Amino acid sequence: MSSIEERVNKIIVEQLGVKPEDVKSEASFVEDLGADSLDTVELVMALEEEFETEIPDEEAEKISTVQSAVDYIKAHS
Protein backbone atom coordinates (compact mmCIF):
# COMPACT_ATOMS: atom_id res chain seq x y z
CA MET A 1 0.00 0.00 0.00
CA SER A 2 1.42 3.37 -0.99
CA SER A 3 1.70 6.26 1.40
CA ILE A 4 -1.07 8.03 -0.54
CA GLU A 5 -3.38 5.06 0.05
CA GLU A 6 -2.43 4.94 3.72
CA ARG A 7 -3.06 8.67 4.15
CA VAL A 8 -6.40 8.50 2.30
CA ASN A 9 -7.48 5.50 4.40
CA LYS A 10 -6.50 7.28 7.62
CA ILE A 11 -8.58 10.32 6.64
CA ILE A 12 -11.57 8.12 5.79
CA VAL A 13 -11.34 6.35 9.17
CA GLU A 14 -11.13 9.69 11.00
CA GLN A 15 -13.84 11.48 9.00
CA LEU A 16 -16.38 8.66 8.82
CA GLY A 17 -15.66 6.96 12.14
CA VAL A 18 -15.28 3.54 10.55
CA LYS A 19 -12.92 0.70 11.39
CA PRO A 20 -9.69 0.57 9.36
CA GLU A 21 -10.50 -2.98 8.25
CA ASP A 22 -13.77 -1.72 6.68
CA VAL A 23 -11.89 0.67 4.38
CA LYS A 24 -11.39 -1.44 1.27
CA SER A 25 -10.49 0.00 -2.12
CA GLU A 26 -13.89 -0.89 -3.63
CA ALA A 27 -15.89 0.43 -0.64
CA SER A 28 -18.46 3.11 -1.44
CA PHE A 29 -18.49 6.00 1.03
CA VAL A 30 -22.29 6.11 1.11
CA GLU A 31 -23.38 2.50 0.55
CA ASP A 32 -20.60 0.62 2.37
CA LEU A 33 -19.24 3.12 4.90
CA GLY A 34 -22.50 4.87 5.85
CA ALA A 35 -21.54 8.41 4.82
CA ASP A 36 -24.16 11.04 4.09
CA SER A 37 -23.78 14.04 1.78
CA LEU A 38 -22.29 16.22 4.52
CA ASP A 39 -19.79 13.49 5.39
CA THR A 40 -18.65 13.30 1.78
CA VAL A 41 -18.18 17.09 1.58
CA GLU A 42 -16.13 17.04 4.80
CA LEU A 43 -14.14 14.08 3.49
CA VAL A 44 -13.26 15.95 0.28
CA MET A 45 -12.25 19.00 2.34
CA ALA A 46 -10.00 16.84 4.51
CA LEU A 47 -8.40 15.30 1.41
CA GLU A 48 -7.81 18.78 -0.04
CA GLU A 49 -6.13 19.89 3.18
CA GLU A 50 -4.00 16.75 3.60
CA PHE A 51 -2.75 16.73 0.01
CA GLU A 52 -2.67 20.52 -0.50
CA THR A 53 -4.82 20.34 -3.60
CA GLU A 54 -8.16 21.72 -4.71
CA ILE A 55 -10.87 19.32 -5.84
CA PRO A 56 -13.49 21.08 -8.00
CA ASP A 57 -17.12 20.28 -7.16
CA GLU A 58 -17.69 18.45 -10.45
CA GLU A 59 -14.70 16.21 -9.69
CA ALA A 60 -15.68 15.77 -6.03
CA GLU A 61 -19.04 14.35 -7.13
CA LYS A 62 -17.20 11.56 -8.97
CA ILE A 63 -15.22 10.53 -5.89
CA SER A 64 -17.54 7.93 -4.40
CA THR A 65 -15.23 5.06 -3.45
CA VAL A 66 -11.97 4.66 -1.60
CA GLN A 67 -10.17 3.79 -4.84
CA SER A 68 -11.60 6.78 -6.72
CA ALA A 69 -10.25 9.06 -3.97
CA VAL A 70 -6.80 7.44 -4.17
CA ASP A 71 -6.80 7.63 -7.98
CA TYR A 72 -7.77 11.31 -7.97
CA ILE A 73 -5.07 12.23 -5.46
CA LYS A 74 -2.42 10.26 -7.38
CA ALA A 75 -3.36 12.04 -10.60
CA HIS A 76 -3.53 15.56 -9.12
CA SER A 77 -0.89 15.86 -6.42
Curated annotation (Swiss-Prot):
Keywords: Cytoplasm, Fatty acid biosynthesis, Fatty acid metabolism, Lipid biosynthesis, Lipid metabolism, Phosphopantetheine, Phosphoprotein. One of its GO terms (molecular function) is acyl binding. One of its GO terms (biological process) is lipid A biosynthetic process. The keyword Lipid metabolism applies. Pathway: Lipid metabolism; fatty acid biosynthesis. It is found in: Cytoplasm. 4'-phosphopantetheine is transferred from CoA to a specific serine of apo-ACP by AcpS. This modification is essential for activity because fatty acids are bound in thioester linkage to the sulfhydryl of the prosthetic group. Residues 2-77 form the Carrier domain. SUPFAM superfamilies: ACP-like (SSF47336). GO terms for cellular component: cytosol; membrane. It holds the Pfam family PP-binding. The keyword Electron transport does not apply. InterPro entries: ACP, ACP-like_sf, PP-bd_ACP, Ppantetheine_attach_site. Its main location: cytoplasm. PROSITE patterns: CARRIER, PHOSPHOPANTETHEINE. Belongs to the acyl carrier protein (ACP) family. Carrier of the growing fatty acid chain in fatty acid biosynthesis. HAMAP family: Acyl_carrier (MF_01217). This is Acyl carrier protein.
